[in-house]
Amino acid sequence: MEILYQDNRILVCIKPSGVVSTDEPGGMPQRIRDCLGDAHACVRTVHRLDAAVAGVMVLARSRMAAELLSEQVRA
């Protein structure tokens, strides 16, 4: 798992192909928690990439950050 940037609000990483974006076993949020070594870390999906697609993903580290980032994606 390659993390490009992280702070207390967001985390930017490379999603490999073959991995789902959603929070389910083996999905990106779970992989980030595993990478951080914190099974209870708040990691929320802001946008999705198809499972077959590799690319950069932005994930939120709090509910408030997720809401703000989701608004920006919709705009």
Model-based region annotation:
Residues 1-75:
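RNA pseudouridine synthases
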